[in-house]
Amino acid sequence: MRRILKLHRSLQAPISPVTHNFEFITFNTQLHPKLWLELNNKIFISHPDQGNWAIADLENRMSEPWFDPRGFFLCVINEKIVGFCWTKIHQDLVNKEPIGELYVIGVDSAHSGKGIGKALCTEGLIYLKAKGITQAMLYVDEDNEAGKGLYKTLGFN
C-alpha cells in the first residue's frame, strides 16, 4: 500500500545557499511544455500521480490560478532540460497564511548525484521566501529514501 508523507519546514529559518555551476532558467510556457513533459514522464515512468502525463495534464495545471512560471525552475545542460523544481503557493487556506509547496521535483537519472536536485530545491525555497511565504511543504512517498534524505538536508521534517 502506498504511503505519502507531508513534510514541512519554516522559511523564517535560514536557507543555506548551495554553491553550483548549473544553469537555471524559469519555465517558458511557449518553449518548454513538450520538453518538460518528456523529462517528467521519463523520471516518473512508474509513478501513479506524476507519470504518464499528456500535454492536457500540464495545460490544466498551467491554467490554475496558482500557476506562476517564475516559480518553475529548470536546470539546463547543453540546452537540454535535466532537472526541475516546480513551486506552488496555496492561497486558499481558510484563516491561515499562504503556504509554499515544492510541488514537483525531478532530475534525469543520467545527472543524479551531482547536486542538481538540492540546488533546484534551494532555488525554489528562496523564491517562496522572497514571495513572503513563511512555511514550505512537500509530499513524498514514504519509500523514496533518496528524496527523504534530500529533504531532510533542506530542513524538512
Regions found by a protein language model. Name each.
Residues 112, 121-129:
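A conserved short alpha-helix in the GNAT/GCN5 acetyltransferase fold that borders
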Residues 23-38:
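A short beta-loop-alpha structural element at the N-terminal edge
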Residues 47-105:
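A conserved beta-strand-loop-helix scaffold within acyl/acetyltransferase catalytic domains
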Residues 1-2, 114, 118, 142-157:
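Conserved active-site alpha-helix within GNAT-family acetyltransferase domains
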Residues 1-21:
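Acyl-donor-binding surface of acyltransferase catalytic domains
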Residues 128-139:
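Conserved GNAT acetyl-CoA-binding A-motif
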Residues 103-112, 141:
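A short, internal acetyl-CoA/4′-phosphopantetheine-binding micro-motif in the GNAT/acyltransferase core
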